[in-house]
Amino acid sequence: MNSYFNSMKPIICLFLSGLVLLTACQSSKRTEGAVPNIDSLEQALAQLTDPLERIDLKRQIVDLTMEAATPEERCRIFEEFATLVEEEVGMLNQRESDYLEHYYEYRYDDDANPIEPHDSIKQKELGYIQRGLQFDEVGEGIVLLAPAPTLFAKYLSQLPTYYQEYWQLLRDSENIAPDACLVLTWRELGDLIVRYEAYAESNPEQKELFVRLSDNYQYLQMVYMTGTDNTPIANESGSLDPELKSEWQRFMKAYPNSLTTELIKEFLQRKNYSDLNAMQERLEEVQKTSNHPLLLASSFL
């Protein structure tokens, strides 16, 4: 019996080796087959002009390339997808500008009573929703098509935590003041600024991302300290808005080491807040000379 098994060993080994080789060859063929597939999809993408079709096809490409990529490559793949989506959604907003301008007319009568949108309107909107888009009411009667979180969620979950946090900061900073009217509360704006500062402190090695966050951070800080055209920080006599003053005091107490706290302390010493130009110039001066990582990053732009 032993001699029988001994005589079979070389055959079994050869058989197993053949299986391994066959499997490897099949795997190699599948891999080789995937590359032309992606190339053909990229070529097809270059020929497409319809924004929705381009988004759909780019998503197919991302699905094929994301899984085998390194974390850094995944970030690059995702950014390419997000950039394309942003461009195509911009085209859609132009194409649907007339519809978006009348968005509320389809939902309210002349007396501002809610009405049921026509079936054609429902079908139009459903078509966009099914493709991963949504209608954002950004304030001041402005409605825009935008990517729904679900469009990116699957891919974001495959990215490093530092990148997910960076992405969320960008999203939360979008359209905070449509038509120069702040849609966040002063406290919400202050907390968003703190998140930017905390991100820089927690991820000191992400200097490339700091460069991308720098403009947003400066803008948020400017709005928080000097307001906007339609959300002023003071009344006509130059007296600081009581709600904002209370928020500044809360901010100072909660975040004593923040750069923004230094600005608040200086601004609270003012007797009058009518000269916004002087305040904005002072803030710009501080931002240009500060060694805060998010402000230093702006020098590399």
Predicted regions and their residues:
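C-terminal motif of bacterial Sec signal peptides marking the signal peptidase cleavage site
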Residues: 22-24
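Sec-dependent signal peptide recognition
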Residues: 9-16
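N-terminal secretory signal peptides that target proteins for export/translocation
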Residues: 1-8
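Short coil/linker segments at helix-helix boundaries
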Residues: 106-124, 139, 146-148, 156-190, ...
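A cross-kingdom marker for long, charged
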Residues: 222-226, 234-301
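N-terminal Sec/ER secretory leader and immediately downstream segment
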Residues: 33-145
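Short solvent-exposed coil/turn linkers within tandem alpha-helical repeat scaffolds
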Residues: 150-158, 199-211, 251-262
